[in-house]
């Protein structure tokens, strides 16, 4: 890690921590998913037929298996949406706030700044994953399920990995926000990614689609290979490079 990159990461980290948008997103992702998970699990426990029908195979589960399974299903879409919005915001706000021109005068290259932005959001994603997993544990223990056993811990670990990988899946939002010079293109791409993932999963072709792979693996690890999981990070790396390259080529008159 170069000195310039460390400096850029430190600056972007301070900006991210101070952002009301990021704070709100963190709260909505962690508390929102945990609350919805607890509500659906409680409704399923009462035998609500409509809820049980929506849960599919999870309808036959109970306790920790039901709770973690619901959390995984919700996180697969809601987590990706939240991370995509934050990724688009962190990268796109320089354009919407009109501060992008000032970056041309800094001694740190624009490519380094772009790389730092993506890196900071990915680290934040990992922090959110820890908080979300811990909150689900608290919900389970508080809900009378006792301490999780080995199988339950495995499910919680998959929830954590799914959340982290959802951040990687959201990296294209950074590139879209750069090309579109603002927040909205990044959000639009995120929504498109979620919608396309749903379509391909229904069509049975989601294993090699990076947006769907983490969720499919979290639900049933046997159906997803290591190569398919690794491809998620390859695609994230490609879009990170694309974002950095686009920032390097930015011009003041655009």
Residue ranges and their predicted role:
Residues 93, 106, 137-141, 145, ...:
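Transmembrane helix-loop junction
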Residues 88-122:
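Helix-loop-helix units of permease transmembrane domains in multi-pass membrane transporters
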Residues 29-83, 115-180, 221-226, 230-234:
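Secretory targeting signals
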Residues 24-28, 116, 189:
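Hydrophobic core positions of alpha-helical segments in small-molecule transporters
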Residues 1-31, 178:
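Aromatic- and glycine-rich beta-strand/loop motifs that create alpha-glucan
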Residues 83-87, 100, 135, 172-176, ...:
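Hydrophobic/aromatic residues in alpha-helical transmembrane segments
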Residues 2-3, 29, 39-68, 187-254:
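Terminal transmembrane helical anchor/hairpin motif
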């Amino acid at each position: 890690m170069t000195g310039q990159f460390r400096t850029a990461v430190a600056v972007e980290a301070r900006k991210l921590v101070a952002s009301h948008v990021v704070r709100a997103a963190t709260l909505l992702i962690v508390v929102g998913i945990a609350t919805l998970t607890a509500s659906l699990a409680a409704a399923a426990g009462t035998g609500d037929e409509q809820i049980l029908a929506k849960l599919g195979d999870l309808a036959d589960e109970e306790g920790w298996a039901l709770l973690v399974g619901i959390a995984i299903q919700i996180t697969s879409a809601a987590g990706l949406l939240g991370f995509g919005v934050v990724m688009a915001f962190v990268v796109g706000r320089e354009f919407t706030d009109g501060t992008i021109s000032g970056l041309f005068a800094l001694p740190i290259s624009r490519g380094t700044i772009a790389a730092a932005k993506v890196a900071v959001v990915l680290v934040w994603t990992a922090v959110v994953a820890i908080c979300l997993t811990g909150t689900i544990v608290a919900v389970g223990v508080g809900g009378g399920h006792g301490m999780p056993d080995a199988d339950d811990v495995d499910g919680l670990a998959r929830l954590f990995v799914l959340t982290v990988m959802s951040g990687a899946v959201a990296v294209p939002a950074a590139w879209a926000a750069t090309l579109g010079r603002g927040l909205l293109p990044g959000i639009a791409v995120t929504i498109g990614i979620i919608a396309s993932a749903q379509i391909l999963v229904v069509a049975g072709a989601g294993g090699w689609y990076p947006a769907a792979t983490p969720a499919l693996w979290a639900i049933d690890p046997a159906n997803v290979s290591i190569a398919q999981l690794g491809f998620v990070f390859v695609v994230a790396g490609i879009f990170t490079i694309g974002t950095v390259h686009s920032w390097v080529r930015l011009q003041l008159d655009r």
